Amino acid sequence: MKKDDRFAELDASGITAECLVETSDGWDGSPLPNYPEGTPVISIYRYVFPPHSVTADHFHKIINCGVVTKGQITLVCANGREKTVMAGEAVVEIDGEVHHGENCGDIPAEVIMFYAGDGKIPFSFPA
């Protein structure tokens, strides 16, 4: 693994860091929104999707991303575009586009999601 100078605490420790994603764009290539004004509030949530479950259609106004830790999740946009994210893969959500998430698998899927907001803007809005 290539040494990354941003992690001084890892020098000579044997600990490694692997970048799963680093981007200014959502998974579809659209630019991410600016951070909200005011004090930042970082939230991390664990979602568990039962087999064959589907979220309601929704959209986001804040930056959010996640890592699938078990199973797989498919993100489906209202316009038909979709992306399947497997266990161990990361995804940066798209801003303002109506979509839903679904677990098409036969086992529960688990996703750890990170939200960068201000504590006032909801994580998602119903479509």
Summary of predicted features, one role per range:
Residues 79-96:
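Short acidic-glycine-tyrosine-enriched beta hairpin
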Residues 54-55, 71-76, 90:
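Short beta-strand segments in beta-sandwich/barrel cores
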Residues 59, 67, 104-108:
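Extracellular/periplasmic catalytic domains that process cell-envelope and extracellular macromolecules
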Residues 95-121:
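Ligand-binding loop in jelly-roll beta-barrel domains
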Residues 37-41, 52-65:
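A short beta-loop-beta micro-motif enriched in histidine and acidic residues
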Residues 61-79:
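Glycine- and acidic-residue-biased ligand/ion/polar-headgroup-sensing regions
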Residues 1-41, 126-127:
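A short, N-terminal "cap"/entry segment at the start of jelly-roll beta-barrel domains
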